[in-house]
UniProtKB/Swiss-Prot annotation:
GO biological process: mismatch repair
Pfam family membership, one: MutS_I
Name of the featured protein: DNA mismatch repair protein MutS
Task performed by this protein: This protein is involved in the repair of mismatches in DNA. It is possible that it carries out the mismatch recognition step. This protein has a weak ATPase activity.
Keyword Ribonucleoprotein: no
Length: 913
């Protein structure tokens, strides 16, 4: 059987093995909707739970390389005369002029094509063939490059990753078949890095933020006021904030990790680029950040009469940024502000983010503590998130990532999260049942978003239904929980019955495994729609007619293996083996000759073929209408689906943390509120461990250590040799603090932890080439930021200060900084240093204590125990550490001689003094 044919019986899902000829009554033609309904009632169809068979996806090959001869003047759409272009190219240029900064993919037949500069660009970006196209007699050939229509999403994903925006111009109607008749085309989608909703273009476990920044026009860097609004259009999340000073704005921008940042002018772009030249911005000069426009757009979008109801009263900068964001989204998707439209971007009410209700972790601290990525290689493996993420859903993974970005300050809210973890730990069966429920759950947040935007496929709706059907079982698990639980669990205990009804409706209408392409048909169950059932009855009748026609032609020709088959290009035909050609009757019309096969058509078959195509087309159109109505029903429940999805995500995040706790022997810490005056700055961790390093060690045992902060011990001077574990210990304290404040259990035997308002770190330093700052200046800038912003409730982690200058200058700065932190700020601080002279600070400061990393020395060999104990060290073991690192022996021996000489000189100088 040839690959380019499809057996007719498979096409209609009819068994053709029975060769007995049946008498067929005349098939009715041109039935109205009412006639089809009556036909359906005469012969009701029985529901079948069958699996829809989809042909395997075949990748089309891009056209082979050709010698492209292009007139230099025809290279750019800007230089050609539109009057001289063909109608299609004239339309292309018109659309391109409206989207100068975006790549335009224009549908022509089975390909999306680019022309002029865009063609040259995407041929390089996507490594596809650059060819040419005739644009008119006077224009000649122009550059052209294209991608197959069915692979468009994959190629768009590559362009989006390279930070390009794409405009999709698709065919809005099918070809009439009449040569020369223009096909209606129009822009159906604008895809920018921040407005992606397609599954293949998103990172499943990470939010895809689009951000708008409003910056006030002030002169002084510290007097700049700003507003930031960011949204994930795929999940509906919307966050807005405002603040003051460029330094804080720069830090927030780096932490945003946005796919696209919208600003209003090149002046703002130039100002922001001074803070970090590696971040790219989208300048949208037509985007309005005005306060009046913002008020109007926000009220219209959220259908409210006052901004006070969503918390934006008197937050003018946040309001302006949100208005700018909505303004930009309106231009990307013009339907998103039309409340009557079933196709729009759906965003939740904005969450107003304030500094006073979360633990602040600046970008430098995130980087130093390797919270989401490692510092050196920027890898996920080896980060804090990697060490604790055991989530089963993409929603849960994104939720955990958000928690790590913004740990809590409210002790009661933290305890409620701990209580969920406790319930999971106490019952292995409950834990396993929840794992099984969540394991195969789809991404309800993004699935609902695609439905709302009109891009959900039948398979997306099936995934939504399957997820919603699990809600009653999740409810039964939540009802088993004891202790005080978070507010979001109420939604899981009081399920919206309309969501369950929606799930039943989806399952009733859609088959279990629908086709990928909604235009194919075959996705709606029998018995759902009378009109569709009537059309399918007619299709069955025509299928039976073809079966009988095949039997008839076999009898006439006496060719027993004759088949009536179908080809997508020339329809139904009679297929016989070439050896039987002499038996072909006269009424057969030869259609095609192949190596081992002859193909014929007959007048009767061609007449029926037209009717079959009409019925199939009407059936496919009817199925599409039914599906669109179903998708609209889902879209109307987007907010409810996303709301329940967020609760499931939180449950999944806490389930994952409970699994991490069980696997790694974590314990539940006691917490002390910030405003507890009796236990001010009191923190005690017994046998604490670094959660990242412990897992990276695999079978090796991690050395646990204690830490204590109280009124008599606010600043710890930590000394010890390089590679002994000082940095690991410092990071360990910061990581445990973060874990405690997201509600997680922690790696320790016992702990009582004071809530911190900020975590500051200064660990290592390198030149900042983008701003022209030396290592020492970077170090001093970070130190200044800590001293100016830390409070008595902060946690400060310092690993060396003053190394980038002379010994005495560096020691003096380190000494002064230590005293300032201990006496003035009085926050919990660990300062790891090689300046052993700092051990003397203890003598004049009651709240400073010395600790050291123990080292065992055997002749020239040193053994790191990684154990922390009270008391200062007076030796760095630098040469021994260099030897362990593999420094050549000759260099080591020379270093020993130099060290002895320096020590002798130092003694001589002291004696002379």
């Amino acid at each position: 059987m040839k690959e380019d044919t499809i057996i007719q019986k498979n096409l209609f899902a009819i068994d053709n093995e029975n060769n007995e000829q049946k008498e067929i009554t005349k098939i009715p033609e041109d039935l109205s909707w009412e006639d089809l309904k009556k036909e359906s009632q005469k012969r009701p169809r029985q529901r079948k739970n069958t699996t829809n068979l989809i042909n395997k996806f075949k990748t089309d090959l891009i056209s082979k390389n050709k010698n492209v001869c292009i007139n230099e003047e025809s290279y750019s759409y800007k230089t050609v005369s539109k009057l001289k272009l063909t109608p299609v190219m004239k339309h292309y240029v018109t659309l391109k002029e409206e989207n100068k900064d975006r790549l335009l993919l224009y549908r022509l037949g089975d390909f999306f094509e680019c022309f002029f500069e865009d063609a040259v660009l995407i041929s390089n970006l996507l490594e596809i063939t650059l060819t040419s196209k005739d644009a008119g007699k006077e224009i000649g050939k122009i550059p052209m490059a294209g991608v197959p229509y069915h692979a468009m999403e994959r190629y768009c994903a590559d362009l989006i990753k390279k930070n390009y925006s794409v405009v999709i111009c698709d065919q809005l109607e099918k070809s009439s078949g009449n040569y020369g008749t223009p096909i209606k085309r129009g822009i159906t989608r604008i895809i920018t890095p921040g407005t992606v909703i397609e599954e293949g273009m998103l990172i499943a476990k990470k939010n895809n933020w689009i951000t708008a920044i409003y910056l006030s026009e002030e002169n002084s860097n510290e007097s700049y006021e700003w507003g930031i609004s960011k949204a994930d259009v795929s999940t509906g999340e919307l966050i807005t904030m405002e603040g003051q000073s460029l330094s804080k704005l720069f830090d927030e921008i780096i932490k945003l990790d946005s796919s696209e940042i919208i600003i209003g002018s090149n002046e703002v772009r130039n100002l922001l680029m001074n803070g970090n030249s590696q971040i790219s911005y989208t300048v949208s000069q037509e985007t309005n950040f005005g306060i009046n426009e913002a008020n109007y757009l926000i009220k219209k979008y959220f259908q409210i009469v006052s901004l006070e109801g969503i918390g934006l009263k008197n937050l003018n900068n946040a309001t302006r940024s949100l208005g700018g964001l909505l303004n930009y989204l309106k231009k990307i998707n013009p339907l998103n502000l039309d409340k009557d439209s079933s196709v729009k971007i759906s965003l939740d009410f904005p969450q107003i983010q304030f500094c006073h209700n979360k633990l602040i972790i600046d970008y430098q601290t995130q980087k130093n503590l390797e919270i989401k990525n490692t510092q050196r290689e920027n890898n996920y493996v080896g980060s804090l998130l990697w060490s604790i993420d055991r989530t089963y859903t993409c929603m849960g993974a994104r939720c955990l990532r958000r928690w790590i970005d913004s740990p809590l300050l409210n002790v009661n809210e933290i305890y409620k999260r701990q209580n969920i973890i406790s319930n999971f730990i106490e019952s292995k069966q409950v834990r396993m049942d929840t794992q099984n429920l969540l394991r195969a759950m789809g991404d309800l947040e993004r699935l609902a978003g695609r439905a709302c935007a009109g891009h959900a496929s039948p398979r997306d709706l099936i995934a939504i239904a399957e997820g919603l059907k699990k809600l009653p079982r999740i409810k039964s698990i939540i009802e088993l929980f004891k202790y005080d639980l978070p507010d979001w669990t109420d939604q899981l205990k009081n399920i919206d019955e309309e969501l369950l009804e929606l799930a039943d409706t989806i399952s009733f209408q859609l088959i279990e495994h629908p086709p990928l392409n909604i235009s194919e048909g075959g996705m709606i169950h029998d018995g759902v729609d009378n009109i569709l059932d009537g059309l399918r009855n007619l299709m069955d009748d025509y299928s039976e007619w073809l079966n009988q026609e095949e039997l008839k032609e076999r009898k006439i020709s006496k060719i027993s293996n004759l088949k009536i088959q179908f080809h997508k290009n020339f329809g139904y035909y009679i297929s016989i083996n070439k050896s039987k050609v002499n038996l072909a009757p006269q009424h057969w019309i030869k259609r095609q000759t192949l190596t081992n096969e002859e193909r014929y058509i007959t007048t009767d078959i061609k007449n029926k073929e037209n009717k079959i195509f009409q019925i199939k087309s009407r059936a496919s159109s009817r199925e599409y209408e039914i599906f669109c109505e179903l998708r609209k029903m889902v879209a109307e429940k987007t907010k409810q689906i996303r709301s329940i999805a967020k609760s499931i995500a939180s449950l999944d995040a806490l389930l994952g943390l409970s699994i991490t706790s069980v696997e790694n022997n974590f314990i539940k810490p006691a917490l002390i509120p910030i405003n507890d005056s009796q236990k001010k700055n009191s923190t005690k961790i017994i046998a604490g461990r670094n959660p990242i390093v412990e897992q990276l060690l695999n079978d090796k045992k991690f050395t646990a250590n204690d830490i204590c902060f109280d009124d008599n011990q606010k600043l710890i001077i930590l000394t010890g040799p390089n590679a002994s574990g000082k940095s690991c210990f410092i990071r360990q304290i910061g990581l445990i603090q973060i874990l405690a404040q997201i509600g997680s259990f922690i790696p320790a035997n016992k702990a009582e932890i004071k809530i911190a308002d900020r975590i500051f770190t200064r660990i290592g330093a390198v030149d900042d080439q983008s701003s022209g700052q030396s290592t020492f200046m970077v170090e001093m800038s970070e130190t200044a930021s800590i001293l100016n912003q830390a409070t008595s409730s902060s946690l400060v982690l310092l690993d060396e200060i003053g190394r980038g200058t002379s010994t005495f200058d560096g020691l003096s700065i380190a000494w002064s900084v230590s005293e300032y932190l201990a006496k003035k700020i009085k926050c919990n601080t660990i300062f790891a240093t090689h300046y052993h002279e700092l051990n003397y600070l203890k003598n004049s400061n009651k709240n400073i204590e010395n600790f050291q990393v123990l080292v065992e020395q055997n002749n020239d060999q040193i053994i790191f125990s990684h154990k922390i104990k009270k008391g200062g060290s007076n030796k760095s073991y630098g040469i021994e550490a260099a030897k362990l690192a593999g420094v050549p022996r000759e260099v080591i021996e020379k270093a020993k001689l130099v060290l002895n000489s320096l020590e002798e000189n130092n003694k001589f100088n002291k004696n002379n003094d």
